[in-house]
Amino acid sequence: MAITKEDILEAVAGLTVMELNDLVKAFEEKFGVSAAAVAVAGPAGAGAAAAEEKTEFDVVLSAAGDNKVGVIKVVRAITGLGLKEAKDLVDGAPKNVKEGVAKAEAEDIVKQLTEAGAKAEIK
């Protein structure tokens, strides 16, 4: 005879608050989860406020420019890609060169790409 959901609900309904607390802790340990409440996202604020809070940025290669070989070298150094993969990335511009990086690192990458003759931007 299998235990049904109704049987479980009846058993839980008869527990005290302390027993329920122990039950929740047992579930957390058994299944490796947390019963903490999930924070619900509030309404969207002003765009400027959201931009200030952004901590991860994507560096986008907009155009390779005239010095394609130099840009490929910089892309290889930044990403660790092989020659063919870096060439494909540069040829396929606009493409993301690096994703989820800190602002300072993103600015440094854009500077390197720009010095090599490419057009790059931070998003």
Curated annotation (Swiss-Prot):
Which cellular component terms (GO) are annotated to the entry? cytosolic large ribosomal subunit
GO terms assigned for molecular function: mRNA binding; structural constituent of ribosome
Which branch of life, at top level? Bacteria
Q: List the residue ranges forming a coiled coil, or say none.
A: none
Q: Which UniProt keywords apply?
A: Ribonucleoprotein, Ribosomal protein
* GO BP: translation
Supply the InterPro entries for this chain: Ribosomal_bL12, Ribosomal_bL12_C, Ribosomal_bL12_C/ClpS-like, Ribosomal_bL12_oligo, Ribosomal_bL12_oligo_N_sf
- Pfam families, A to Z: Ribosomal_L12, Ribosomal_L12_N
Functional note? Forms part of the ribosomal stalk which helps the ribosome interact with GTP-bound translation factors. Is thus essential for accurate translation.
The record's similarity note reads: Belongs to the bacterial ribosomal protein bL12 family.
Assembly with partners or alone:
Homodimer. Part of the ribosomal stalk of the 50S ribosomal subunit. Forms a multimeric L10(L12)X complex, where L10 forms an elongated spine to which 2 to 4 L12 dimers bind in a sequential fashion. Binds GTP-bound translation factors.
Q: What is this protein called?
A: Large ribosomal subunit protein bL12
Recall the taxonomic lineage recorded for the source organism: Bacteria, Pseudomonadati, Pseudomonadota, Betaproteobacteria, Neisseriales
